[in-house]
C-alpha cells in the first residue's frame, strides 16, 4: 500500500492540471507524510522499539530538519557502516555547532541526551587523554597510580633536590662560554634571511587575495613570531587571522557564528587549490582555527626573475567568444593553447596567477576546470603550514611583543632559542594542555623586566583594533639591528661584532632557568602589566587560588592556578590555566633539568627531543626484555612489573617522560603479545618429551630453547660490536630478523639508542647535502657541515669515517633538485565544476590491526584495508582514509 501511494504521488506531481490546484497539492502532501509516520510507528513496534511514539517523533523531526536520526539497531541484523558513520558525523557536526536546529528538535534532543549521559559518567585524563569510565575519585587516582606513578615519583625526587642545585654556587666561566656559543650557533639557523622572509610575505599577499575573493568584508592580518620577532626560519608555521574591521569597530567581532566563518574560510582555501586532506577546521577549540599541514612538504624557493606560475584553464563546451576574464588574463600572461578546449596561462607575478585562479573558480563557466599546472612553480602560499583564525587578539599581542623584541637583538634571540627548547622538552605544547609560545614569551620578557634589562612598554600603547598598515610584515634581522640577516652558523662565532651578544646569551639563559627554579609560584604572578622591580602581583590579589580552581568537566574547561601567567590584555585569563598539579610539576622539573645541563657543561642537551626519544625507546626496550627472557617471569604481565623492568633498563628519565603524555596500554599489549609467543614456544617444546627419560628430543631441543639462547647471545655480540664501532654503528645486514625491533636503524646502519641514530643522521645528512651541492674537497664539505651542526655537537671521528672513500656506500645522497621535482610532480591542485564521482572508487574495508600506514608512514596505528583488494592492496590509517574520502567527494 505504501508503494502504491508513493507511485500515485509521483504521477500526481507530474499531472499538469494539479499545478493549478495548490490547495489540493498541500493536502495530498500532508496525507503522504501521515502515512509515512504510521509506517514508521508500525515497523518500530515490530522491531521491539520500547517507545514507538518517541521514535515517530524523531522521524517526524527528521523530515523537517537536516539532522539524521540515530538508527534503531535490531539484534541479529547486520547493518552497513554508512548509517552509523552518518550518525557519528551528525553528532560531530552538532558538537561543532555546524547544524541549525530548533529547541524542540527531537533528533537534537536525542544527541544532547546521549552526549550528556556519556560525559556525566566519564572523565578524561589530562596527561594521556584516556577516558576514565567513572568520575569517582578513587578510580581517577587508581588510573594515575597505574599509568603515571613513575612520573609523579620522578618529579617529587627532582623537586626535592632543588636546594642542592641552588647551592651549587657559581657556574664556571667555561660553561657560560660554551652555553653562549651553543645558543648563538643554534639561533643563527632560526633566521634564514631577508630573501626567505620575502617568501612568507608573498604567501600572505596571496592568502589575502584568496580571502578577499571568496569571503567578503574580511581582511587578513599576520601575527605570531614572524611579526613579533620579524624573522622566519623557513620551517615554522605561519599565523594568519581574518578580521571584519567594520564589525569590530561596531563591537560585533568576533561574530556569534565564528565556527561557520572558519568553515567558510576552509571552503575558500579549498577552492583556491588546497587539498581537502591537508586542511583541518578545528572548531571545538577555545579559538577556532583552520590548520594546514602538508603531507609532502614542498621545498622553499626564492622568487627568481624567470619564474612562471602556470594555470591550466579547460572547458568541455566551446563558446562563441572567450570570457572577459580570459581576455584580461591574456594581457598580463603568456598564453599556450594545447587544444581546442585547454589553455595554459603563464604568469610572471604569482599574485596575478592566484587572482586569476580564484576568479575562474568563482565566476567561471559551469563546465570549466581550472588547475595549477603539474610540475610548474606553485605560488608561495602552498609551501607554508599555517593556522588561520578570525580573532584580533593575536595581532595586538604580536605588535606588543615586538616593542620589546626590537629593543635589542639578545631579547628576540633568547626568546626564539627558549621557544625551541620548550617545544623539545614538551612544555610548549598547547594541544596536550601545556604552555603556548605566547606564554613562553611572557615568561622571558617578565624575567628581563625584573632584572631591568628592557624598558617597560604599557600594554595600552597598542590599539585593540588593527590598522591596515599593520598588514605589512617588516623584516628584522635576528642577530643584528640592521642588514639582510641569514648569518651562517660557522661565521657567528668568528664575528667580533657578535661577541657581546654571545656573552649576553651565555649569561642570561642560565639565569632564566635559575629565576624560574627559585620562583615561588604560589606567591607570584608572571605579568607584563606593571614595570619590573616593584612588589610582585600575587595570586591572592587576582583570586587565582586553589579554592577557585575548576577541576572537573572537559579538559578545555578546567582551570588551575598552580602556575599563574597573566595575559597582558584579557582580564582574569591565566595562560597556565591548563597546567594541572602533575603538569605543573613536570614544567618545574624541566626548568631545573635545563639549569642542571648548563651547570654540568652540557648545553647541547637543551635541544634534545626527549619526547621523541622516549616514544621510540620504550618499545625497543620491551622487545629487548623479551629477547633476554625477562618477560617470561611476568605471567600475566602487569603495568607495575613492566614499569620497574623498564626503569632498570631504560632509566627513570625515559619512563617518566613517556608517562607525561602516554599511558601503558600500548606497551602492555606489546609485552603480553611477545610473552604469549614465548610461552607457546615453551609449551610446544615441553609437550614433546622422551618416553624413557622425560627429556625433549634432540630436534625440539635444537629448535626451541637454544634458539632463544642463540638470539640473546647474538644480541650481546651486536652490543659489543656497537661499543667498538662507535658513532658510525654497524651494518643492519648483521641484524637478525628477530632483533630488528631492538635496535634503531637508519641508512643501512644499526644503533644502540635513538640518540646515537639521530646523531649519525645529522652528520650523514650534512655530508650528503654538501656533496649534493657540488662540494668535492674535504675543506668544502667541512665548511658546509659547520653551518648545519653546532660545534659542541659536531663529532670529528664520525665525520672522518664518513669522509673516507667508500665508507658512505649505504648512505643515500639525494639532490635537493630531485626532491623538489618529485614534490612538484606529486602535488596536483585543481578546482573543477560539475565533476562526477568515480563509480568504482574503493571504500574503507575491514580493520587490519596495527602497523605502518602505506600512505603516510605512521607506525603503531590502527589500519584498515580497502574494500577492493584487487584495486588497492594497501593498509591505511584513519586519517588517510578520511583525507581520501574528502578528496573523493
Curated annotation (Swiss-Prot):
Residue span(s) of domain PAP-associated: 505-572
Top EC class for this record: transferase
Gene Ontology BP term (one): RNA 3'-end processing
Keyword terms: Cytoplasm, Magnesium, Manganese, Metal-binding, Nucleotide-binding, Nucleotidyltransferase, RNA-binding, Transferase, Zinc, Zinc-finger
Subcellular compartments: Cytoplasm
The keyword Metal-binding is assigned to this record: yes
Site, Important for catalytic activity: residue positions: 387
Catalyzed reaction equations: RNA(n) + UTP = RNA(n)-3'-uridine ribonucleotide + diphosphate
Zinc finger residue extent: C2H2-type: 123-151
Binding site for Mg(2+): 237, 239
SUPFAM superfamilies according to UniProt: Nucleotidyltransferase (SSF81301), PAP/OAS1 substrate-binding domain (SSF81631)
Cofactor details (free text): Binds 1 Mg(2+) or Mn(2+) per subunit.
Gene Ontology CC annotation, any one: cytoplasm
Amino acids binding Zn(2+): 125, 128, 143, 148
Sequence positions that bind UTP: 225, 236-239, 394-398, 419, 423, 437-438
Family affiliation: Belongs to the DNA polymerase type-B-like family.
Protein name: Terminal uridylyltransferase 3
